């Protein structure tokens, strides 16, 4: 494609995707509220507050695809989540509607379903069970995206990211790990598909201990290749076994279920 927008490009995952997604477009437009490293060849850097509708409109203009990693990615006071994940996402979808409806990869989260027990295997249509205000904001985001698809035909992949890290490093991640390579191959598949719609995609690698069923995604032609099982021995040898009553091994959202409702100081 001509120009691919990556929001949240200064974040931990955004910095990884900056390098990995460069071959997908002639120009990579990188955006974040935080300062970005200087633009390299075939890059554009934009400092943008998602809560500023005019800034978001300018950020989206001229883009042929969007990978939306921006916003708040952990549990925070509602006032912060509201600006980045609710107002900000509305601004993004309005900007996309005004600029030809480029296809969107929306970084949703496993915390939309965090209160499900780890004993359950989940398909894409299970009712939401968010484990905090962050998870609630991602439920909002998924529903906003579905409304824009039904009303305007805006296509979005709703990627419920598990644990997108270089390697799994705890027992829960043996089920939730999503390798960087598998995320990149998913993004490639989303933009390659002739028709996308607005599907839920469980953002996880091909983990033997996985809880999530992506069998509905045959039309994408995407198959994750990595498997957290390769790291099980290292985890068991270096990590004390968790208490069976610990949220880390009881709930799919892990310790997020233990978070309080944080208040703005």
From Swiss-Prot:
Q: How does activity depend on temperature?
A: Activity increases with increasing temperatures between 4 and 42 degrees Celsius. Activity remains near 80% of the maximum after exposure at 37 degrees Celsius for 30 minutes.
Enzyme nomenclature, EC number = 1.1.1.203
pH note = Optimum pH is 8.
Q: Which Gene3D superfamilies match?
A: NAD(P)-binding Rossmann-like Domain (3.40.50.720)
Recount the UniProt induction comment for this entry: By D-galacturonate.
Which residues does the annotation say bind substrate? 73, 109-111, 163, 172
Q: In which pathway does it act?
A: Carbohydrate acid metabolism; D-galacturonate degradation via prokaryotic oxidative pathway
GO molecular-function terms, A-Z: nucleotide binding; uronate dehydrogenase activity
Q: Detail which positions bind NAD(+).
A: 12-13, 32-34, 49-50, 69-73, 138, 164
Give the reaction(s) catalysed: beta-D-galacturonate + NAD(+) = D-galactaro-1,5-lactone + NADH + H(+); beta-D-glucuronate + NAD(+) = D-glucaro-1,5-lactone + NADH + H(+)
Q: List the disulfide bonds.
A: none
Catalytic residues as annotated in Swiss-Prot or TrEMBL: 134 (proton acceptor)
Name the enzyme group at the top EC level. oxidoreductase
Which parts of the chain are coiled coil?
none
User: What protein family does this chain belong to?
Assistant: Belongs to the NAD(P)-dependent epimerase/dehydratase family.
Role: Catalyzes the oxidation of D-galacturonate and D-glucuronate to galactarate and D-glucarate, respectively. In fact, in water solution the substrate D-galacturonate is predominantly in pyranosic form whose beta anomer is converted by the enzyme to D-galactaro-1,5-lactone; in solution, this reaction product rearranges to the more stable D-galactaro-1,4-lactone. Makes part of the oxidative degradation pathway of D-galacturonate, which allows A.tumefaciens to utilize D-galacturonate as a sole carbon source. Cannot use NADP(+) instead of NAD(+) as cosubstrate.
Q: Give the quaternary structure.
A: Homohexamer.
Q: What else is known?
A: D-galactaro-1,4-lactone was previously believed to be the product of the reaction of D-galacturonate oxidation.
Q: What is this protein called?
A: Uronate dehydrogenase
Native species: Agrobacterium fabrum (strain C58 / ATCC 33970)
Which gene does this sequence derive from?
A: udh
